[in-house]
C-alpha cells in the first residue's frame, strides 16, 4: 500500500514538472528532427550491469579490517597496519611532503599501475580516483616521465607511505585483497598526506582507547601523532578511521566514541564529506564541491530560497550506498537565457564531467523531470554568471534498484533479467519524456507477472496523464493488444514484486507520436 501511494505522489510531481515552463537543452538536442539521431543521443540507458564499485571484498568487514586481513602473513613492513615505514616523517605537518600544485590550481599526482590487475580492477581503481577529480583539485594522472610518482603494485597486502616521498613511491594494493573502493581511496589518502583519523593529536576528545583490550604488540598502532588537523572537526565517518574492535585481544571494543558510544565508525563505502574537506583545505583547493553520500537526502543551491550568488561554479556528487540514483527537483528558478548560456544546471550519469550527460543545460522556472542514473553515482553542476540571479533550486535524491530515464525514440526496455525471471522485492521505475508537442506511445509486447487478487503481489503501473492518473495495476499473463498513449509528453512505468513467486516479467517498446 505504501509503495503504491508513494508511486502515485511521485507521478503527480513528474506530471506537474513537465507541464511547467523550463528551458532544458538535452544532449539529444536534435530529438525533434531525426529519430535516428534520437536513438544515438539517448541520455540515459536503462542498463543492469555489474557495477565494479558495488562489489566489496569481505563485505562484512570495514576498510581497516580488510586491510589487516590482506596484510596477514606478508613481509610488508608497516606501522598502524598499512602505513609503509619510513623514518622521521610527519608529512601532513611538512609542506615538503605535499604534492606540488600547478599554475592552474590543479594538484597532479602521477601513478603507474602494474600489470597484475584485471579489467574490472582497473575500472574500480578509475572509479575510486574519479571522486577526487570531481570534488577536489587533486588529479591522479597516468605516469609518463615524471620523477615523482606512485608506483602501485600487487605484491601482497595494502600499504602506502605518508605524503610525497619522492621517486617511484611504493603503494601496495593486492589484487586479491585490496581492490575495494574504500581501500583504494584510503591508501591514496595516505599518499596525499593523511594519517588514520584515530591517531589525530586531539583524538582523546572524541574517542576512548581501551588499551586493556588491545593486543600488546599492537598498542603502538594507537599512538597519537602531532598532526595538522586543519581546523576541521573529528570525523567518525572518515574512510581513514579504525573500527571499534581493531586489534582486540578479547573481542571487546578497543575504540569507543564519546560522548555517544553508538556512533558508527570504520565505514567502508569511500571518502566522507569531511575527508573531502580535509583534502581541499590541505591543498588549498579553490573548488565549490559537495558530497551527498547517504541513501536519500536533499540538495539545495547556495542561499536558497534567497538568490544564489553570481559567478558560481559548484558541483554535487550524489553517491548512494547502492542502486541507481534518482533526483527529483521540487523547486527550480535559474536565470533564463537563450540556450541557457548564462546560468544553468547540468547533470551527468556518473561521478565526473567525462560521463554521459543526462541534462545538458537547464534554466528557467519549471521543474526538471525525474532523473535516474545508471549507477549509484550522479554529478550535478551549477554555473552562474556575473549578472541576474534567481532563487535557485531544491531537490531530493534517493535510489531505486532498477529502471531508467529516456529522452529519445524508439526504445525497447525490459524488466530485470528478462526473459529470465525477475528477482524478489524488485522496485523499478522508468520515465519517458518526449519533446514538447509529442506524446509517448507504449506497446507492451510480452507480459507475465505473478497473479493475485487486485494484483497485490507483483504488479506494473503506468502513469500517463497530467493529473498523475494510474493505469493498472497489471499482473498475471496479459496480452496487450493495442498501444498505450500518454495524455502529455511524459509517462512513468513502475514495477514491484514481493518475496515469493517470480516470472519472466515484461518487454516494452515506445515511440514518440504527435
Curated annotation (Swiss-Prot):
Annotated Peptidase M12A domain residues: 90-286
GO biological-process terms attached to the record: proteolysis
Gene3D superfamilies for the chain: Collagenase (Catalytic Domain), Spermadhesin, CUB domain
Keyword Hydrolase: yes
InterPro entries given in the database record: CUB_dom (IPR000859), Hatching_enzyme_Uvs2-like (IPR017370), MetalloPept_cat_dom_sf (IPR024079), Peptidase_M12A (IPR001506), Peptidase_Metallo (IPR006026), Sperma_CUB_dom_sf (IPR035914), ZnMP_hatching_enz (IPR034039)
Keyword Magnesium tagged: no
PROSITE patterns: ASTACIN, CUB, ZINC_PROTEASE
Enzyme class: hydrolase
Glycosylation sites: 112, 199, 421, 427, 464
Name of protein: Embryonic protein UVS.2
Taxon lineage: Eukaryota, Metazoa, Chordata, Craniata, Vertebrata
